[in-house]
């Protein structure tokens, strides 16, 4: 059975005060796993506060060296990270990250025994052109062919047209795409695909989380804006019970 995940992606938001609020709220559930993908400057404090589980929002493709501003997989491990997001649409858009780079990032995470949360999703133009499957295969195939996927791997589907727009995918459409992702993975990893956890990310809120989590191939959420509010995040988790 796939245990649901509620992953909070704070992006470039948050401070010590908000972190303390979440720690005091003691958001835990035996029905789902909570993951906090925090700005790197907050990870040390989060670890000391006992906030679990922790994730990086990105990682360097390099092991170490003269790469100003980068954070290595070993540094994330030192800060208590069990997970790390790679391939988020904002990294793809603003930093022009492609699959070749993401493969190297994945390798660094694997070497540090950190589980990747690999983000994929179609652009508005691809959605309008009914080219979602082609977009997902383009983002998945290079990874699948590198023999990097294992039973711990998490894939997050984030329709780019839904992120930060308030326009969430319908439950039926989200399920259709998640099923498609599982089928694509199964072509290379037939024994792993049924147990792989697939997350939905894209304007997740308490009022749509319940219908989304009921879908057969949706195993949780990668939550943006709503994860910055203790009350909203808690309500989303409650829908997963």
Curated annotation (Swiss-Prot):
Enzyme class, broadest EC rank: isomerase
The organism of origin for this protein: Dichelobacter nodosus (strain VCS1703A)
EC number from the UniProt entry: 5.3.1.1
Role noted for this protein: Involved in the gluconeogenesis. Catalyzes stereospecifically the conversion of dihydroxyacetone phosphate (DHAP) to D-glyceraldehyde-3-phosphate (G3P).
InterPro entries assigned to the protein according to its UniProt record, in alphabetical order: Aldolase_TIM, TIM_sf, TrioseP_Isoase_bac/euk, Triosephosphate_isomerase, Triosephosphate_isomerase_AS
Protein name in UniProt: Triosephosphate isomerase
Active site (catalytic residues): 88, 158
Reaction(s) catalysed (UniProt annotation): D-glyceraldehyde 3-phosphate = dihydroxyacetone phosphate
């Amino acid at each position: 059975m796939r245990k649901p995940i509620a992953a909070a992606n704070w992006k470039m938001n948050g401070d010590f005060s908000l972190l303390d609020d979440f720690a005091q709220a003691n958001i835990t559930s035996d029905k789902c796993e909570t993951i906090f993908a925090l700005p790197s400057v907050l990870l040390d404090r989060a670890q000391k506060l006992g906030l679990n589980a922790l994730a990086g929002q990105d990682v360097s493709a390099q092991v170490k060296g003269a790469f100003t501003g980068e954070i290595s997989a070993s540094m994330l491990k030192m800060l208590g990270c069990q997970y790390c997001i790679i391939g988020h649409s904002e990294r793809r858009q603003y930093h022009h990250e492609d699959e070749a780079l993401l493969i190297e990032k994945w390798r660094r995470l694997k070497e540090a025994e950190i589980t990747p949360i690999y983000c994929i999703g179609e652009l508005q133009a691809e959605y309008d052109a009914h080219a979602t499957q082609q977009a997902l295969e383009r983002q998945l195939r290079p990874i699948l062919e590198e023999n990097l996927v294992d039973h711990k791997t998490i894939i997050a589907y984030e329709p780019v047209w839904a992120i930060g727009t308030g326009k969430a995918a319908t439950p039926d459409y989200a399920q259709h795409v998640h099923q498609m992702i599982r089928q694509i993975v199964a072509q290379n990893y037939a024994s792993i695909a049924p147990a792989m956890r697939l997350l939905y990310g894209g304007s997740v809120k308490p009022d749509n989380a319940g219908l989304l989590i009921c879908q057969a191939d949706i195993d949780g959420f990668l939550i943006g804006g709503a994860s910055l509010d203790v009350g909203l995040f808690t309500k989303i988790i409650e829908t997963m019970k």
